[in-house]
Design a protein with these regions (language model features):
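Polytopic transmembrane helical bundles with strong interfacial aromatic enrichment
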Residues: 1-187
Length: 187
């Protein structure tokens, strides 16, 4: 049995290394000119949420939290897990409570989805053509990840679907980095 904290720490560093390698790859294949397309910081906030979600995904995996509350969109009969209290979210021990970790993982996914829709709307509204391809790729991967996450829950965290969900997080990181890179540099 591995501590979910150690598992998430290990996974986080693996994703940081992957991110640095992929960012350097993008530097090698594209000519850069510093010019942000989206003037706000939504892409950076999106990236932070993705990394946070991966950490909570590791918590879910390490605690087998995906094997409880195998319903969606509710957790059992309510939005919040009925074996807990909302006040418990504000205690450090929440990170070791399987139902709260699953609750947080679900809700970070909802935030990511809402933020993606906001960013995509901004890209298309402002006709930022250079970001059309990256935002479409990112959208496909976001929807894939959400779909696989829901299937993982409904399957009781079956090994095949859970593995696909974990693998697609790699695609999500790379698609997010690609969008962030294309937003930051024009070529």
């Amino acid at each position: 049995d591995v501590s979910h904290f150690r598992l998430s720490f290990h996974l986080l560093f693996a994703f940081i290394i992957l991110s640095l390698i992929f960012w350097n790859y993008l530097d090698l294949i594209y000519l850069k000119q510093n010019e942000r397309k989206l003037k706000n910081f939504l892409p950076e906030i999106f990236m932070i949420l993705i990394f946070l979600q991966i950490i909570f995904g590791a918590f879910v995996s390490g605690m087998d939290a995906g094997k409880i509350y195998n319903t969606w969109p509710l957790m059992g009969n309510s939005y919040f897990p009925d074996d807990n209290k909302i006040i418990n979210l504000f205690e450090f021990s929440a990170l070791s409570d399987a139902s709260l970790v699953q609750y947080l993982h679900r809700n970070i996914a909802y935030l990511i989805f809402i933020l993606y829709i906001t960013i995509a709307f901004t890209v298309y509204k402002n006709k930022i053509v250079i970001l059309f391809k990256p935002i479409l790729i990112l959208g496909f991967v976001v929807f894939l990840q959400i779909f696989l996450g829901i299937l993982t829950l409904l399957s009781g965290a079956g090994i095949l679907i859970s593995s696909l969900h974990q693998f697609s997080s790699i695609l999500l990181i790379t698609a997010s980095l690609y969008f962030l890179y294309r937003n930051k540099f024009s070529f």
